[in-house]
Structure formats: C-alpha cells, structure tokens
Amino acid sequence: MEEYKTICFLVADILLIAAGTIYGWKFLKKRNYLLGLECWIVAISATNLLFSALLFSVPGFEGVSLTLYGNAMYLDAFSRAVGIPLIGMAGLMAVTHAYHPSKTADILWFAGGFAAAGILIVVAPENRHILGQFGESALVHAVESIKPWFYLVMWSLFSCFLLYFAWRLFKVGERLHGWSMLVAMVAGQTIATIYDFFEIPGDDADQTLFFIAALSTWAFLAMAMYYAYCAIERSKPATTLAKARVGQPYRTAGS
C-alpha cells in the first residue's frame, strides 16, 4: 500500500511538472508573461519536491533533500499567497478585461510576490532564528498565526474570479471549458481548505494522500486555465487578436 501511494505521488508530481512547463511555455508564446512565468514557478517547485522525495532516503543526500524541500516550500508560499491568486487573476484578465501590464509591472508583480513569500516563510518556527531576537516578537507570532487564514482568503478570492471566468465562458457558448473551470475551482478550493486545517482520513505523517490530490488538482488547473483562456480569446474579434499578438492593449464590448 505504501509503495502504491509513493508511486501515485511521483506520478502526480511529474504531471504537475509537465503541466506547468508545457502550459507555461504556451502562455509565454501568447506573450502572457504573468501566467507563463507563474506556471513555470509551479513546475520548478514541483521539481524541487520530486527530487527532495527521491533523494531523502539516499545516504549522504539528506542535506540536499532538505534544501530542495525548502526551495519547494518557498515557491509554494509564493504561489499560494500571490502567484496563483493575484498574478494568475491578473494574467486571466488579459482576455476578460484587456489587462496588458508593462514589463516593469510584470517585474513588480513577481518581486512583490517573492518578498511576501519570504516573510511568510521566515516567520515559521523552524526559520525564526534568521530574525534573531525579533523572531520571538509578538508581531512574528501574529503573522504566523494568521498565515493559514491568509492563504485560504487569497485562494477564495481567486475562486470567486474563476466563477466569473466560467460565467464568461458560458456567455460565449464555451460550455465545456466553462464546466472545466468550475471543476478546477471546486477542486482547488477544496485543496486550499484542507491544506492547513484538516487531515485526510488514513493519510500518513507526510500527507501523501493530500499531496497526490493537490498536485493532481494543480496540474488540471494549469491545463484548464490555458484552454479556457484560448476559448475566450477565440471569441474576440479578429482585430482584437491581431492587437494582442503584438502586445497592444485592446477593448471589446463587455470587456
């Protein structure tokens, strides 16, 4: 049973790496750097998690495994706090609200996200020593205590936007993609709710069952977002698509 769970975990992780890499590249080809780079960040996080799991039991590589796991958790904090909820939302707004930020704005989105992730990681009990005496301050403890709720609120905001995104898909007749976004929204919100608050019955100390579900859900989300994005893009007038390809802002009725 344990071997079966391990295999399922590895398969789910590889699926997320593949989805993040492939659809990240596809978004980048559409010049949507927000969604493209965020998908790649998710893929890099999953890659670190994969090799951390593979090397954990290899003699002499325990330190490398822990470093890779730390990298994965930092990027996970980035994606949960800012990357998917805010950057993902902003990226999808390219086809719903004609939002096309400048390269400077793109950089600021990610710089702000990485800074926020750093704060969220450093307040964890195992990392507070980095802050010295300030690590035991009331402020640090307060940030750590509200962190799970912060993650949940941010993902819930993203789920609300996905509901709107699904409505836009139904509005243009893309029912299949509308339903795929609703499924992705429900699954993603379920994972976000379970993450810091509940345990799956029968799960082990490493939360293997949870991570199988989470990694699979995020892989599906990346795929569903890309094809839903393309579906709304197809509904735009030809002149709109031409402007989008050269990176010009565009407006359409209802945008």
Regions found by a protein language model. Give the residues of each.
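Membrane-interfacial loop-to-transmembrane alpha-helix junctions, especially the N-terminal start
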Residues: 28-44, 101-110, 174-184, 237-240
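Non-cytosolic membrane-interface motifs at loop->transmembrane helix junctions
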Residues: 65-78, 140-151, 204-215
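Internal transmembrane alpha-helix with an interfacial aromatic "cap," most often the third helix
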Residues: 18-27, 52-64, 68-112
